[in-house]
Regions:
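Active-site groove signature of glycoside hydrolases
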Residues: 303-315, 393-429
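Glycan-recognition surfaces
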Residues: 356-391, 440-534
Length: 534
């Protein structure tokens, strides 16, 4: 069978039954296996089993539907499948539709155990890849050699852009592959770069896992893989984001009429809480009204004029009920009114997923989410798809934000702890949502409710994905390892990632490295160049 050729602006494809050969500016960067393995998950008496797909063969033929549109089919012991490759001048989109019945498990893009070949994955000519994420582990690297795998994790940018940018020696530009889903179909956490073997040499494939939370009875099109061609790594992220907005996959936040006070500067009380610790009290235990009055008075005495003050962890007791601890905050309304008289807006630290103190019929459980070499699991978790919890949270937000008598009249939220979430096959929500999709459901609920109560309420958070653009006013650069000594560069890159993923978003530069004076002061001096000083 003859191979098909497609030529775009900066790339060309040679499309055959055994490989989709990708050229960038005339240089071959990868041979993608046309097949994708789609596993399933079954449950019996609370025990979950993953099933790998077997029995598929190299496609007998590829059909050219039109100029730039190609179709082929596959059959395995689990699914009938239809593959589609849609090419345009800027890039190409690869999609897989499964037909049959089952719950989708692990998905290995461009990899399969075909019966008629020893090849199990795709060949690569690129030498390294860029990970658009951030972490506090000093061992984390944004640039990895192609010969090493990367298992994605949720820590700071939650979720990150689901894409990788690849560099090939001899090329100035970059080749990118990104995973894109429809609204409501982000039932996954990870997007991983994996290694395999093709005969005696290394190959690669990309993967995600729906962990059995997406049921198919008929047909379902998996999140697609879109290929991009750009000038550099950040350009790939920008193109990934623009693709979502341009195709209607996501709604763009136009960011019109931004209140002046959203632009700061910001004072956050977290590190001051540590400095104010007394015997027998934890850092979180210093989230007290008297401590924050001291902070407010220090601000005044030093002629610092912030537009907002963040009351950090743990002003509330318990986390789930999310009401001011009466011992620590005997009169939060009096405090917020006093701050308003000083021109300062009060932002409350808010623990996402916090189920502490919630009724049993509003929460869910899950497994520990992978984090470095261990896992994090702090159940119970609030279930944002549960109608009882949704109604409960709306009442909580009204009490905290409203200026009505008896309410707290606060001005917004700093959303945190997004990584401590229900995870795994057993993490069953009332609405059947999971992963990034359930995270979006929680953001949607908080954002829409807050704006209804107080239109200029500020939502400060750390998602770095175009799907979350519409529910984030201010992106927080998040934590920094005090063992490092290059905070300006680390935070500067994170700011560029947020700007690439959510154009125009305000940037909260967050805290400095208090373990090293020189690194801290250098970052302080550079904060205005990066975002809003905090």
């Amino acid at each position: 069978m003859e191979n098909y050729i497609y030529k775009g602006d900066r790339y060309s494809l040679e499309i055959g039954t055994s490989a989709i050969r990708v050229y960038q500016d005339g240089v071959r960067v990868t041979d993608l296996m046309p097949a994708t393995s789609v596993g399933t998950v079954t449950e019996l008496d609370g025990e979950f089993t993953e099933h790998e797909e077997h029995g598929e063969r190299t496609p007998a033929a590829i059909e050219k539907i039109s100029d730039g549109e190609f179709l082929w089919k596959g059959t395995s012991d689990l699914w009938n499948k239809e593959y589609r490759l849609s090419c345009d001048r800027e890039g190409f989109t690869y999609s897989v539709t499964v037909k049959g019945k089952g719950r989708v498990g692990k998905v290995d893009y461009f990899s399969a155990h075909l019966e008629d070949t020893d090849y199990t994955c795709s060949d690569y000519n690129f030498c390294e890849y860029f990970i658009p994420c951030g972490g506090t582990d000093p061992a984390f690297r944004n640039i990895m050699p192609a010969a090493l795998p990367y298992r994605s994790f949720f820590e700071l940018l939650i979720p990150p852009p689901y894409c990788f940018s690849f560099r090939t020696e001899g090329l100035d530009g970059r080749f990118g592959l990104g995973m894109c889903a429809k609204d409501g179909e982000y039932n996954f956490f990870h997007f991983d770069y994996n290694l395999g073997f093709n005969t005696r040499r290394r190959g690669f494939y990309l993967s995600t896992a729906l962990d059995g939370h997406t049921a198919v009875d008929g047909e379902f099109t998996l999140p697609v893989i879109r290929a991009f061609f750009g000038d550099d790594d950040l350009d790939i992220v920008r193109k990934y984001s623009a693709y979502h907005f341009d195709t209607g996959l996501c709604r763009k936040n136009e960011r019109k009429d931004i209140p002046r006070w959203w632009r700061g500067p910001i004072v956050c009380g977290w590190n001051e809480q540590e400095m104010l610790i007394t015997d027998g009290c934890s850092q979180a235990g210093m989230a007290r009204q008297d401590a924050y009055m001291k902070i407010a008075d220090m601000i005044k005495d030093h002629n610092i004029r912030p537009t907002m003050l963040i009351i950090d962890d743990k002003w509330q007791n318990p986390y789930g009920a999310c009401l001011p601890d009466p011992e620590r905050w005997p009169d939060m309304r009096a405090f917020t009114d006093e701050m308003h008289s000083r021109g300062i807006h009060t932002i409350l630290w808010f623990r996402l997923w916090g189920g502490e103190g919630l009724p049993e019929d509003e929460v869910m459980t899950g497994e520990g989410i992978p984090y470095r070499s261990f896992s994090l699991n702090y159940p119970p978790y609030a279930d944002p798809t549960n109608e009882k919890y949704r109604a409960h949270l709306k009442k909580i937000l009204h009490y905290l934000l409203s200026d009505e008598e008896g309410c707290m009249n606060c001005d917004g939220f700093k959303l945190d702890y997004s990584l401590i979430m229900p995870y795994g096959k057993s993490a069953k929500s009332a609405g059947g949502k999971y992963g990034a999709q359930m995270t979006k459901e929680l953001y949607n609920l908080i954002y829409s409710t807050a704006k209804e109560i107080k239109p200029d309420a500020l939502i400060n958070a750390s998602p770095c994905h175009p799907y979350f653009d519409e529910v984030c006013d201010q992106a927080r650069l998040h934590d920094y390892s005090w063992d490092l000594r290059n905070e300006t560069e680390t935070m500067g890159l994170r700011a560029k990632l947020f700007e690439a993923a959510m154009p125009g978003v305000l940037i909260d530069t967050d805290s400095v490295n208090f373990a090293n004076h020189d690194d801290a002061m250098r970052f302080y001096r550079n904060m205005p160049k990066i975002g809003i000083p905090d």
